[in-house]
Regions:
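Non-catalytic, conserved peripheral segments adjacent to functional cores
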Residues: 1-105, 124-126, 133-186
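Conserved metal-binding segment of the jelly-roll/cupin
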Residues: 102-124
C-alpha cells in the first residue's frame, strides 16, 4: 500500500497494491497488521454500501462525540468527488477540507478519522460506494453541514445536485463551532 498524507493531519489517501491479469484483478482493501504498521489501530464495527446515480450528493455528514466515526471509504464501481471537512474545534486546520477522486478504476481509498464531516458527489450512474466505520450509526448524534456553506467554499463542480430530503436541518460551520463551544464539546 502507498499512503499519502494530506494537508490535514490524520487524513490519508491510500493506494492499494493491485494485481491484474487476464482474469481481472485482486487487491487487499484492509489488513489490520498493515494498518497497524501505518500507525492506525482501527476497529471497524460496521460496513455500509450505497448505490447512487450521477449527480447525487451525500453529506456532509458527521456524528458527534462520543459516537464520532472514523471511515475508510472507497468506490467499487463508478466514481465520486469525495470530501472530508475538519470539524475538530481544537484543530489548526478546523474548517479546512480535502477532496479526492475515488473510482472503481483507480481503487484509491480515503481514511477519514473521527472529527470530520464527510460527503461525496457521484460522477457516474450506478456508482457503488463502500465505507467501513469505527463506530455504529447513532441517530441521536448525527449531524450534517450545509454542502454549499459559503465559509467552506467547496467547488463541487455541480450546481444542482440530487439531495436527500432526510437532512433539512443542515448547519453552517460557524454555527457548529458556536454550538460546540456552548456545549463545552471542544
Amino acid at each position: 500500500m502507498i499512503v499519502q498524507k494530506t494537508s490535514i493531519q490524520d487524513l490519508l489517501i491510500i493506494q492499494p497494491r493491485v494485481f491484474s491479469d487476464d482474469r481481472g484483478y485482486f487487491y487487499e482493501s484492509y489488513n489490520k497488521e498493515t494498518f497497524l504498521k501505518l500507525g492506525l489501530d482501527l476497529n471497524f464495527v460496521q460496513d455500509n454500501q450505497s448505490l447512487s446515480q450521477k449527480g447525487v450528493l451525500r453529506g456532509l455528514h458527521f456524528q458527534n462525540p462520543p459516537f464520532a466515526q472514523g471511515k475508510l471509504v472507497r468506490v467499487i464501481k463508478g466514481s465520486v468527488l469525495d470530501i472530508a471537512v475538519d470539524i475538530r474545534s481544537k484543530s489548526p486546520t478546523y474548517g479546512q477540507y480535502e477532496k479526492v477522486i475515488l473510482s472503481g478504476e483507480n481503487k484509491t481509498m480515503f481514511w477519514i478519522p473521527p472529527g470530520f464531516a464527510h460527503g461525496f458527489i457521484t460522477l457516474e450512474d450506478d456508482t457503488i460506494f463502500n465505507y467501513k466505520c469505527t463506530v455504529e450509526y447513532n441517530k441521536e448524534s448525527e449531524g450534517a453541514l450545509l454542502w454549499k456553506d459559503p465559509t467552506l467554499t467547496i467547488d463541487w463542480n455541480l450546481d444542482n445536485p440530487i439531495e436527500s430530503k432526510k437532512y433539512p436541518a443542515t448547519e453552517l460551520l460557524e454555527k457548529l463551532l458556536l454550538n460546540k463551544c456552548h456545549n463545552k464539546n471542544i
